[in-house]
Swiss-Prot record:
<protein>
    <recommendedName>
        <fullName>Chaperonin GroEL</fullName>
        <ecNumber>5.6.1.7</ecNumber>
    </recommendedName>
</protein>
<feature type="binding site">
    <location>
        <position position="51"/>
    </location>
    <ligand>
        <name>ATP</name>
    </ligand>
</feature>
<dbReference type="InterPro" id="IPR018370">
    <property type="entry name" value="Chaperonin_Cpn60_CS"/>
</dbReference>
<dbReference type="GO" id="GO:0016853">
    <property type="term" value="F:isomerase activity"/>
</dbReference>
<dbReference type="GO" id="GO:0005524">
    <property type="term" value="F:ATP binding"/>
</dbReference>
<dbReference type="GO" id="GO:0042026">
    <property type="term" value="P:protein refolding"/>
</dbReference>
<dbReference type="InterPro" id="IPR002423">
    <property type="entry name" value="Cpn60/GroEL/TCP-1"/>
</dbReference>
<keyword id="KW-0413">Isomerase</keyword>
<keyword id="KW-0963">Cytoplasm</keyword>
<comment type="function">
    <text>Together with its co-chaperonin GroES, plays an essential role in assisting protein folding. The GroEL-GroES system forms a nano-cage that allows encapsulation of the non-native substrate proteins and provides a physical environment optimized to promote and accelerate protein folding.</text>
</comment>
<feature type="binding site">
    <location>
        <position position="415"/>
    </location>
    <ligand>
        <name>ATP</name>
    </ligand>
</feature>
<feature type="binding site">
    <location>
        <begin position="30"/>
        <end position="33"/>
    </location>
    <ligand>
        <name>ATP</name>
    </ligand>
</feature>
<dbReference type="GO" id="GO:0140662">
    <property type="term" value="F:ATP-dependent protein folding chaperone"/>
</dbReference>
<dbReference type="InterPro" id="IPR001844">
    <property type="entry name" value="Cpn60/GroEL"/>
</dbReference>
<feature type="binding site">
    <location>
        <begin position="479"/>
        <end position="481"/>
    </location>
    <ligand>
        <name>ATP</name>
    </ligand>
</feature>
<dbReference type="InterPro" id="IPR027410">
    <property type="entry name" value="TCP-1-like_intermed_sf"/>
</dbReference>
<keyword id="KW-0067">ATP-binding</keyword>
Length: 548
């Protein structure tokens, strides 16, 4: 086991504080409409430029191990806020820095660290309740645009694009961000249910100019099994041929004579047919087949349910207005399933999302939810260079997370005003002793930090502006972009309540633990063991040279 280095008391806390300040000072320059960029060096390729707090935080590692421990703990604040709400990382870092700085001053002055932490926790619990009271719902397109604009560093086009995407696919719809090929941002919306399985044979293509299969008002056969024997399909093929409608077959696999027969029938025009593999694997494939059956009003032919493909009828088949298949994807548009059944399935998936423990499972369940409830929107980010592309993509992703958070829990006045108002409302809060009261004051002072930093980054005097805002009421605040005072809601400066709440809670949680730290332990640096020159191969060669 490696030897350890230890530091105690004030010496440990000073080291930790230095690390906190190094990281927070690098992150906080990005805050607000006039926040600056940070350039991050990469081990290969061009440096990246960002205004995203968590991206800056992740890059910081300090040489001194004790200082680095302080920096890593604040990095945890930024990461947690990012995971919870997708934004607010800079605010969370700033709040943590303020609480740690003010808290450690109080500890140095002789206050009890545990009582300080209790006071901070008490203030944060009350502040969260007040934030909920200040919050207003964010449901209309205008408010969503404003939230997206603020989070995308005052880029109105990004805000409008996100609002348009949410309008088209619904609040539960999947919106993904990709790198585009042009200079302009683009929005691509896929209506209906799309899954990543293409046609099993190019001979099914009936639109050679575009290389796709298009089926109008088709029947849809869903089978949770491999189909290789053509005989078990003959009854259903004959029924479909008599109806004059096309047929889409979705199965675990289709091979051998079954596939060959379908291709021949399709090419001769006897029955218009196409086949694709079922999406997903294992249990997820069964669930997705069930989703398709609910959407199209059919049944999944499954041997587990003692259903026989040979005995299936037209009533077992689903239907849709249109199906489009290319070599990679299948899109089912206008499924004729009952609305009540679809809503019931959506509720079931929502319940599964709440119970899911892994991020991967949640992501896949959200994709299924979106495909059932509306569709998928793809935001394609345009830029002139790769460096700009990466920076812009990160901003768009932040804005998307912020708008989702706003729809979920509502919005409050932005620009640091909400926390200042909350601090004013709970200024009379008291603890069980004077040390707890100091902890409460530490938290209240920290709630002013975001406003002070926004003002500082815009080149104005923080104390003057903060006092002016504190003297105002309601949504009255300072617009750093235009250097004027007024109603922040009217200015369109909004923050999602969830983002502000998460930032405050995670900052107080980690900062409270740091204030109560009394000892820090880390590995001692390993010494380089250099071999003696006399034992090196070169020494031996020298001896040989002397013999000659």
């Amino acid at each position: 086991m490696a030897a350890k280095d230890e530091k105690f008391g004030n010496e440990a806390r000073i080291k930790m504080l230095r690390g906190v300040n190094v990281l927070a000072d690098a992150v906080k320059v990005t805050l607000g409409p006039k926040g600056r960029n940070v350039v991050l060096d990469k081990s290969f390729g061009a440096p990246s430029i960002t205004k995203d707090g968590v991206s800056v935080a992740r890059e910081i590692e300090l040489e001194d191990k004790f200082e680095n421990m302080g920096a890593q703990m604040v990095k945890e604040v930024a990461s947690k806020a990012n995971d919870a709400a997708g934004d607010g990382t800079t605010t969370a870092t700033l709040l943590a820095q303020s609480i740690v700085n003010e808290g450690l001053k109080a500890v140095a002055a002789g206050m009890n660290p545990m009582d300080l932490k209790r006071g901070i926790d008490k203030a944060v619990i009350s502040a969260v309740e007040e934030l909920k009271n200040l919050s207003v719902p964010c449901s209309d397109s205008k408010a969503i645009t404003q939230v997206g604009t603020i989070s995308a560093n005052a880029d109105e086009k990004v805000g409008a694009l996100i609002a348009e995407a949410m309008e088209k696919v619904g609040n539960d719809g999947v919106i993904t961000v990709e790198e585009g090929t042009g200079l302009q941002n683009e929005l691509e919306v896929v209506k209906g249910m799309q899954f990543d399985r293409g046609y099993l044979s190019p001979y099914f293509i009936n639109k050679p100019e575009t290389g796709v299969v298009e089926l109008e008002n088709p029947y849809i056969l869903m089978a949770d099994k491999k189909i290789s024997n053509v005989r078990e399909m003959l009854p259903i093929l004959e029924s479909v041929a008599k109806s004059g409608k096309p047929l889409l077959i979705i199965s675990e696999d289709l091979e051998g004579e079954a596939l060959a027969t379908l291709v021949v029938n399709s090419m001769r025009g006897i029955v218009k047919v196409a086949a694709v593999k079922a999406p997903g694997f294992g249990d997820r494939r069964k669930a997705m087949l069930q989703d398709i059956s609910v959407l199209t009003g059919g049944s999944v032919i499954s041997e587990e349910l003692a259903m026989d493909l040979e005995k299936s009828t037209l009533e077992d088949l689903g239907q849709a207005k249109r199906v489009v298949i290319n070599k990679d994807t299948t899109t089912i548009i206008g499924g004729v399933g009952e609305k009540q059944a679809i809503q019931s399935r959506i509720s079931q998936i929502r319940q599964e999302i709440q119970e899911a423990t892994s991020d991967y499972d949640k992501e896949k369940l959200n994709e299924r939810l979106a495909k059932l409830s509306g569709g998928v929107a793809v935001l394609k980010v345009g830029a002139a260079t790769e460096v700009e592309m990466k920076e812009k993509k990160a901003r768009v992703e932040d804005a998307l997370h912020a708008t989702r958070a706003a729809v979920e829990e509502g919005v409050v006045a932005g620009g640091g005003v909400a926390l200042v108002r909350v601090a004013g409302k709970i200024s009379n809060l008291r603890g069980h002793n004077e040390d707890q009261n100091v902890g409460i004051r530490v938290a209240l002072r920290a709630m002013e930090a975001p406003l002070r930093q926004i003002v500082s980054n815009s080149g104005e005097e923080p104390s003057v502006v903060t006092n002016n805002v504190k003297d105002g009421k309601g949504n009255y605040g300072y617009n750093a972009a235009t250097d004027e005072y007024g109603d922040m809601i009217d200015f369109g400066i909004l923050d999602p309540t969830k983002v502000t709440r998460s930032a405050l809670q995670y900052a107080a949680s980690v900062a409270g633990l740091m204030i109560t730290t009394e000892c820090m332990v880390t590995d001692l640096p390993k010494e380089d063991k250099t071999s003696d020159a006399s034992s090196s191969p070169a020494g031996g060669m020298g001896g040989m040279g002397g013999m000659m």
